Amino acid sequence: MTNLRKTHPLMKIVNSSFIDLPAPSNISSWWNFGSLLGVCLIIQILTGLFLAMHYTSDTMTAFSSVTHICRDVNYGWLIRYLHANGASMFFICLFLHVGRGLYYGSYMYLETWNIGVLLLFAVMATAFMGYVLPWGQMSFWGATVITNLLSAIPYIGSDLVEWIWGGFSVDKATLTRFFAFHFILPFIIAALAGVHLLFLHETGSNNPSGLSSDADKIPFHPYYTIKDILGVLLLILALTSLVLFSPDLLGDPDNYTPANPLNTPPHIKPEWYFLFAYAILRSIPNKLGGVLALVLSILILAVVPFLHTSKQRSMMFRPFSQCLFWILVADLLTLTWIGGQPVEHPFIIIGQLASILYFLLILVIMPITSLFENNLLKW
Protein backbone atom coordinates (compact mmCIF):
# COMPACT_ATOMS: atom_id res chain seq x y z
CA MET A 1 0.00 0.00 0.00
CA THR A 2 1.34 3.43 -0.90
CA ASN A 3 1.94 5.85 1.91
CA LEU A 4 -1.14 7.99 2.69
CA ARG A 5 0.94 11.16 2.79
CA LYS A 6 1.87 10.58 -0.88
CA THR A 7 -1.67 9.86 -2.13
CA HIS A 8 -4.08 11.95 -0.02
CA PRO A 9 -4.99 15.14 -1.98
CA LEU A 10 -4.20 17.48 0.95
CA MET A 11 -1.38 15.50 2.52
CA LYS A 12 0.56 15.21 -0.73
CA ILE A 13 0.75 19.02 -0.99
CA VAL A 14 2.23 19.16 2.53
CA ASN A 15 4.45 16.17 1.70
CA SER A 16 5.90 17.73 -1.45
CA SER A 17 6.47 21.06 0.33
CA PHE A 18 7.83 20.08 3.74
CA ILE A 19 8.65 16.35 3.88
CA ASP A 20 9.89 14.80 0.62
CA LEU A 21 11.00 18.12 -0.85
CA PRO A 22 14.47 17.70 -2.43
CA ALA A 23 16.71 20.36 -0.87
CA PRO A 24 20.37 21.26 -1.53
CA SER A 25 22.68 19.52 0.94
CA ASN A 26 24.75 22.63 1.64
CA ILE A 27 22.26 25.41 2.49
CA SER A 28 23.42 27.35 5.54
CA SER A 29 21.52 28.97 8.42
CA TRP A 30 20.86 31.98 6.16
CA TRP A 31 18.18 29.77 4.57
CA ASN A 32 16.33 29.52 7.91
CA PHE A 33 14.69 32.93 7.65
CA GLY A 34 11.89 31.83 5.31
CA SER A 35 10.49 29.47 7.94
CA LEU A 36 11.15 32.07 10.67
CA LEU A 37 9.09 34.61 8.73
CA GLY A 38 6.27 32.05 8.54
CA VAL A 39 6.44 31.59 12.32
CA CYS A 40 6.49 35.39 12.82
CA LEU A 41 3.38 35.74 10.64
CA ILE A 42 1.55 33.05 12.64
CA ILE A 43 2.55 34.72 15.94
CA GLN A 44 1.36 38.11 14.63
CA ILE A 45 -1.99 36.74 13.37
CA LEU A 46 -2.71 34.90 16.65
CA THR A 47 -1.69 37.73 19.01
CA GLY A 48 -3.43 40.24 16.73
CA LEU A 49 -6.64 38.20 16.80
CA PHE A 50 -6.70 38.23 20.61
CA LEU A 51 -5.91 41.95 20.70
CA ALA A 52 -8.75 42.66 18.25
CA MET A 53 -11.18 41.00 20.70
CA HIS A 54 -10.54 43.80 23.20
CA TYR A 55 -9.55 46.76 21.01
CA THR A 56 -12.00 49.46 19.89
CA SER A 57 -11.21 51.43 16.73
CA ASP A 58 -12.68 54.73 17.83
CA THR A 59 -10.68 57.91 18.47
CA MET A 60 -12.34 58.40 21.86
CA THR A 61 -11.66 54.89 23.19
CA ALA A 62 -8.72 53.43 21.17
CA PHE A 63 -5.99 54.60 23.56
CA SER A 64 -7.91 53.57 26.69
CA SER A 65 -8.80 50.19 25.15
CA VAL A 66 -5.07 49.46 24.73
CA THR A 67 -4.53 50.55 28.36
CA HIS A 68 -7.40 48.24 29.37
CA ILE A 69 -5.76 45.34 27.48
CA CYS A 70 -2.49 45.92 29.36
CA ARG A 71 -4.05 46.40 32.81
CA ASP A 72 -7.25 44.35 33.00
CA VAL A 73 -7.16 41.55 30.42
CA ASN A 74 -5.54 38.29 31.56
CA TYR A 75 -2.01 38.33 30.13
CA GLY A 76 -3.12 41.24 27.93
CA TRP A 77 0.23 42.99 28.51
CA LEU A 78 1.99 39.85 27.24
CA ILE A 79 -0.17 39.59 24.11
CA ARG A 80 0.24 43.31 23.36
CA TYR A 81 4.03 43.30 23.76
CA LEU A 82 4.41 40.01 21.85
CA HIS A 83 2.52 41.66 19.00
CA ALA A 84 4.48 44.94 19.09
CA ASN A 85 7.90 43.29 19.43
CA GLY A 86 6.86 40.45 17.11
CA ALA A 87 6.68 43.10 14.39
CA SER A 88 10.30 44.05 15.13
CA MET A 89 11.41 40.41 14.94
CA PHE A 90 9.43 40.09 11.69
CA PHE A 91 11.39 42.96 10.14
CA ILE A 92 14.76 41.71 11.43
CA CYS A 93 14.03 38.36 9.74
CA LEU A 94 12.78 40.15 6.60
CA PHE A 95 15.91 42.28 6.24
CA LEU A 96 18.18 39.27 6.80
CA HIS A 97 16.12 37.20 4.32
CA VAL A 98 16.38 39.92 1.64
CA GLY A 99 20.09 40.42 2.42
CA ARG A 100 20.65 36.68 1.96
CA GLY A 101 18.86 36.86 -1.41
CA LEU A 102 21.08 39.75 -2.54
CA TYR A 103 24.32 38.10 -1.37
CA TYR A 104 23.74 34.66 -2.83
CA GLY A 105 21.96 35.73 -6.03
CA SER A 106 18.59 34.20 -5.10
CA TYR A 107 16.99 37.07 -7.05
CA MET A 108 17.69 35.14 -10.25
CA TYR A 109 14.44 33.27 -9.54
CA LEU A 110 12.40 36.18 -10.93
CA GLU A 111 8.85 35.19 -9.93
CA THR A 112 9.86 34.22 -6.39
CA TRP A 113 11.86 37.44 -5.99
CA ASN A 114 9.14 39.76 -7.34
CA ILE A 115 6.48 38.23 -5.11
CA GLY A 116 8.97 38.68 -2.26
CA VAL A 117 9.25 42.41 -3.07
CA LEU A 118 5.44 42.61 -3.14
CA LEU A 119 5.35 40.84 0.24
CA LEU A 120 7.84 43.37 1.64
CA PHE A 121 5.56 46.25 0.57
CA ALA A 122 2.51 44.50 2.06
CA VAL A 123 4.26 43.88 5.41
CA MET A 124 5.46 47.51 5.53
CA ALA A 125 1.92 48.78 4.84
CA THR A 126 0.49 46.48 7.53
CA ALA A 127 3.09 47.56 10.10
CA PHE A 128 2.47 51.24 9.36
CA MET A 129 -1.30 50.89 9.83
CA GLY A 130 -0.79 48.83 12.99
CA TYR A 131 1.37 51.59 14.48
CA VAL A 132 -1.53 54.03 14.10
CA LEU A 133 -4.02 51.89 16.06
CA PRO A 134 -2.94 52.62 19.70
CA TRP A 135 -3.74 56.30 18.93
CA GLY A 136 -0.82 57.75 20.85
CA GLN A 137 0.98 60.94 19.82
CA MET A 138 3.41 59.21 17.47
CA SER A 139 0.58 57.09 16.02
CA PHE A 140 -1.44 60.18 15.12
CA TRP A 141 1.41 62.34 13.87
CA GLY A 142 3.09 59.46 12.04
CA ALA A 143 -0.18 58.78 10.22
CA THR A 144 -0.58 62.49 9.43
CA VAL A 145 2.95 62.92 8.06
CA ILE A 146 3.07 59.70 6.00
CA THR A 147 -0.42 59.97 4.48
CA ASN A 148 0.29 63.64 3.70
CA LEU A 149 3.16 62.52 1.45
CA LEU A 150 0.58 61.40 -1.11
CA SER A 151 -0.40 65.06 -1.57
CA ALA A 152 2.89 65.39 -3.51
CA ILE A 153 1.34 63.39 -6.38
CA PRO A 154 0.53 65.96 -9.10
CA TYR A 155 -3.10 66.92 -9.78
CA ILE A 156 -4.85 64.18 -7.75
CA GLY A 157 -2.65 64.43 -4.62
CA SER A 158 -4.81 66.47 -2.24
CA ASP A 159 -8.04 64.69 -3.25
CA LEU A 160 -6.33 61.33 -2.76
CA VAL A 161 -5.17 62.26 0.76
CA GLU A 162 -8.67 63.39 1.79
CA TRP A 163 -10.11 60.20 0.29
CA ILE A 164 -7.69 58.08 2.38
CA TRP A 165 -8.41 60.13 5.50
CA GLY A 166 -12.17 59.97 4.98
CA GLY A 167 -12.33 63.66 5.94
CA PHE A 168 -10.15 66.75 6.21
CA SER A 169 -7.70 65.31 8.75
CA VAL A 170 -6.64 62.03 10.33
CA ASP A 171 -9.70 61.20 12.45
CA LYS A 172 -12.23 58.50 13.39
CA ALA A 173 -12.82 57.40 9.78
CA THR A 174 -9.06 57.01 9.23
CA LEU A 175 -8.58 54.96 12.39
CA THR A 176 -11.53 52.66 11.59
CA ARG A 177 -10.37 51.92 8.04
CA PHE A 178 -6.77 51.43 9.16
CA PHE A 179 -7.99 48.84 11.67
CA ALA A 180 -10.00 47.07 8.95
CA PHE A 181 -7.03 46.99 6.58
CA HIS A 182 -4.60 46.03 9.35
CA PHE A 183 -6.85 43.05 10.13
CA ILE A 184 -7.25 41.80 6.55
CA LEU A 185 -3.72 42.36 5.16
CA PRO A 186 -1.94 39.61 7.16
CA PHE A 187 -4.25 37.04 5.55
CA ILE A 188 -3.40 38.46 2.11
CA ILE A 189 0.27 38.25 3.13
CA ALA A 190 -0.23 34.58 4.10
CA ALA A 191 -1.79 33.87 0.67
CA LEU A 192 1.08 35.69 -1.09
CA ALA A 193 3.59 33.71 0.99
CA GLY A 194 1.91 30.54 -0.31
CA VAL A 195 2.42 31.75 -3.90
CA HIS A 196 6.01 32.73 -3.01
CA LEU A 197 6.61 29.12 -1.89
CA LEU A 198 4.82 27.72 -4.94
CA PHE A 199 7.20 29.53 -7.30
CA LEU A 200 10.22 28.64 -5.14
CA HIS A 201 9.32 24.93 -5.34
CA GLU A 202 9.08 25.19 -9.13
CA THR A 203 12.83 25.82 -9.29
CA GLY A 204 14.07 24.47 -5.96
CA SER A 205 16.21 26.41 -3.49
CA ASN A 206 19.40 28.21 -4.39
CA ASN A 207 22.50 27.41 -2.29
CA PRO A 208 25.58 29.32 -1.04
CA SER A 209 27.78 28.33 -3.99
CA GLY A 210 25.23 29.57 -6.55
CA LEU A 211 25.83 26.38 -8.56
CA SER A 212 23.17 23.82 -9.53
CA SER A 213 22.56 21.40 -6.66
CA ASP A 214 20.61 18.85 -8.74
CA ALA A 215 23.42 16.32 -8.37
CA ASP A 216 23.31 16.45 -4.56
CA LYS A 217 19.88 16.74 -2.95
CA ILE A 218 18.61 15.55 0.44
CA PRO A 219 15.01 15.28 1.73
CA PHE A 220 13.74 18.32 3.64
CA HIS A 221 12.59 16.09 6.53
CA PRO A 222 14.29 15.31 8.90
CA TYR A 223 17.38 17.39 8.01
CA TYR A 224 15.89 20.83 7.53
CA THR A 225 12.84 20.35 9.77
CA ILE A 226 15.23 19.89 12.71
CA LYS A 227 17.35 22.81 11.52
CA ASP A 228 14.25 25.04 11.23
CA ILE A 229 13.05 24.02 14.71
CA LEU A 230 16.40 25.17 16.14
CA GLY A 231 15.95 28.51 14.35
CA VAL A 232 12.39 28.85 15.67
CA LEU A 233 13.55 28.15 19.25
CA LEU A 234 16.23 30.85 18.96
CA LEU A 235 13.65 33.28 17.52
CA ILE A 236 11.22 32.58 20.38
CA LEU A 237 14.06 32.96 22.90
CA ALA A 238 14.98 36.37 21.43
CA LEU A 239 11.33 37.51 21.26
CA THR A 240 10.42 36.41 24.80
CA SER A 241 13.64 37.96 26.19
CA LEU A 242 12.73 41.26 24.53
CA VAL A 243 9.09 41.11 25.68
CA LEU A 244 9.79 40.09 29.29
CA PHE A 245 12.91 42.17 30.01
CA SER A 246 12.60 45.38 27.97
CA PRO A 247 9.29 45.48 26.06
CA ASP A 248 9.54 49.23 25.39
CA LEU A 249 13.15 49.17 24.15
CA LEU A 250 12.18 49.62 20.48
CA GLY A 251 9.07 51.76 21.03
CA ASP A 252 8.67 55.52 21.28
CA PRO A 253 7.83 57.05 24.70
CA ASP A 254 5.66 59.66 22.89
CA ASN A 255 3.18 56.89 22.10
CA TYR A 256 2.29 56.67 25.80
CA THR A 257 0.71 60.12 25.45
CA PRO A 258 -2.81 60.08 23.95
CA ALA A 259 -3.08 61.59 20.46
CA ASN A 260 -3.50 65.37 20.49
CA PRO A 261 -3.97 67.16 17.14
CA LEU A 262 -3.11 70.50 18.82
CA ASN A 263 0.32 69.45 20.08
CA THR A 264 3.03 68.29 17.66
CA PRO A 265 5.85 66.12 19.14
CA PRO A 266 9.35 67.68 18.73
CA HIS A 267 10.66 64.77 16.62
CA ILE A 268 8.21 62.82 14.51
CA LYS A 269 9.77 59.50 13.56
CA PRO A 270 8.47 56.06 12.57
CA GLU A 271 9.36 52.70 14.13
CA TRP A 272 13.05 51.70 13.81
CA TYR A 273 12.46 49.42 10.81
CA PHE A 274 11.29 52.35 8.64
CA LEU A 275 14.06 54.76 9.64
CA PHE A 276 16.35 53.96 6.67
CA ALA A 277 13.55 54.81 4.20
CA TYR A 278 12.54 57.85 6.29
CA ALA A 279 16.15 59.13 6.15
CA ILE A 280 16.14 58.79 2.34
CA LEU A 281 12.80 60.65 2.21
CA ARG A 282 14.13 63.51 4.37
CA SER A 283 17.43 63.80 2.51
CA ILE A 284 15.72 65.27 -0.57
CA PRO A 285 14.56 68.89 -0.12
CA ASN A 286 11.71 68.49 -2.63
CA LYS A 287 8.46 66.82 -1.50
CA LEU A 288 7.69 64.84 -4.67
CA GLY A 289 11.38 63.94 -5.10
CA GLY A 290 11.47 62.65 -1.52
CA VAL A 291 8.36 60.51 -2.01
CA LEU A 292 9.79 59.04 -5.24
CA ALA A 293 13.11 58.27 -3.50
CA LEU A 294 11.20 56.65 -0.62
CA VAL A 295 9.28 54.32 -2.96
CA LEU A 296 12.35 53.63 -5.13
CA SER A 297 14.45 52.73 -2.07
CA ILE A 298 12.37 49.53 -1.82
CA LEU A 299 11.27 49.17 -5.46
CA ILE A 300 14.95 49.14 -6.50
CA LEU A 301 14.98 45.50 -5.31
CA ALA A 302 12.80 44.59 -8.32
CA VAL A 303 15.52 45.98 -10.64
CA VAL A 304 18.40 44.04 -9.01
CA PRO A 305 18.03 40.87 -11.18
CA PHE A 306 18.45 42.98 -14.35
CA LEU A 307 21.64 44.57 -12.98
CA HIS A 308 23.34 41.19 -12.43
CA THR A 309 26.38 41.40 -14.70
CA SER A 310 28.53 38.70 -13.07
CA LYS A 311 29.01 35.28 -14.66
CA GLN A 312 28.70 33.77 -11.20
CA ARG A 313 25.40 33.75 -9.37
CA SER A 314 26.55 33.96 -5.75
CA MET A 315 29.01 36.39 -4.11
CA MET A 316 30.70 33.45 -2.37
CA PHE A 317 33.72 33.57 -4.72
CA ARG A 318 33.62 37.34 -5.48
CA PRO A 319 35.64 39.23 -2.83
CA PHE A 320 35.19 42.72 -4.36
CA SER A 321 31.40 42.32 -4.54
CA GLN A 322 31.45 41.03 -0.97
CA CYS A 323 33.20 44.22 0.19
CA LEU A 324 30.60 46.35 -1.61
CA PHE A 325 27.75 44.28 -0.13
CA TRP A 326 28.99 44.95 3.41
CA ILE A 327 29.48 48.65 2.57
CA LEU A 328 25.80 48.62 1.52
CA VAL A 329 24.85 47.03 4.87
CA ALA A 330 26.89 49.68 6.75
CA ASP A 331 25.22 52.38 4.62
CA LEU A 332 21.75 51.10 5.55
CA LEU A 333 22.70 51.06 9.25
CA THR A 334 23.94 54.67 8.86
CA LEU A 335 20.62 55.64 7.23
CA THR A 336 18.72 53.94 10.09
CA TRP A 337 20.71 55.99 12.62
CA ILE A 338 20.20 59.25 10.65
CA GLY A 339 16.44 58.62 10.38
CA GLY A 340 16.18 58.80 14.16
CA GLN A 341 18.17 62.05 14.46
CA PRO A 342 16.80 65.62 14.28
CA VAL A 343 17.04 67.52 10.97
CA GLU A 344 20.16 69.59 11.70
CA HIS A 345 23.87 69.76 10.84
CA PRO A 346 25.76 67.37 10.50
CA PHE A 347 22.92 64.82 10.19
CA ILE A 348 21.46 66.41 7.04
CA ILE A 349 24.61 66.06 4.94
CA ILE A 350 25.40 62.57 6.33
CA GLY A 351 21.88 61.45 5.36
CA GLN A 352 22.22 62.93 1.87
CA LEU A 353 25.59 61.27 1.26
CA ALA A 354 24.33 57.92 2.61
CA SER A 355 21.24 58.14 0.36
CA ILE A 356 23.35 58.88 -2.74
CA LEU A 357 25.72 56.03 -1.85
CA TYR A 358 22.77 53.61 -1.42
CA PHE A 359 21.47 54.18 -4.96
CA LEU A 360 24.96 54.44 -6.48
CA LEU A 361 26.06 51.12 -4.98
CA ILE A 362 23.07 49.16 -6.27
CA LEU A 363 22.65 50.84 -9.66
CA VAL A 364 26.23 51.59 -10.72
CA ILE A 365 29.11 50.43 -8.52
CA MET A 366 28.11 46.79 -7.93
CA PRO A 367 27.27 45.96 -11.59
CA ILE A 368 30.55 47.55 -12.79
CA THR A 369 32.54 45.68 -10.12
CA SER A 370 30.94 42.40 -11.27
CA LEU A 371 32.16 43.08 -14.82
CA PHE A 372 35.63 43.83 -13.46
CA GLU A 373 35.61 40.49 -11.58
CA ASN A 374 34.63 38.68 -14.80
CA ASN A 375 37.70 40.20 -16.49
CA LEU A 376 39.94 39.19 -13.59
CA LEU A 377 38.90 35.57 -14.19
CA LYS A 378 39.39 36.11 -17.96
CA TRP A 379 35.71 35.29 -18.62
From Swiss-Prot:
Record flagged with keyword Signal: no
Cofactor comment: Binds 2 heme b groups non-covalently.
GO cellular component, one term: mitochondrial inner membrane
Record-listed heme b b562 binding positions: 83, 182
Biological processes annotated in GO: mitochondrial electron transport, ubiquinol to cytochrome c
Keywords in alphabetical order: Electron transport, Heme, Iron, Membrane, Metal-binding, Mitochondrion, Mitochondrion inner membrane, Respiratory chain, Transmembrane, Transmembrane helix, Transport, Ubiquinone
Record carries keyword Electron transport: yes
Membrane-spanning residues: 33-53, 77-98, 113-133, 178-198, 226-246, 288-308, 320-340, 347-367
Family, similarity comment: Belongs to the cytochrome b family.
Leftover remarks: Heme 1 (or BL or b562) is low-potential and absorbs at about 562 nm, and heme 2 (or BH or b566) is high-potential and absorbs at about 566 nm.
Name of the protein: Cytochrome b
Organism for this UniProt entry: Sorex daphaenodon
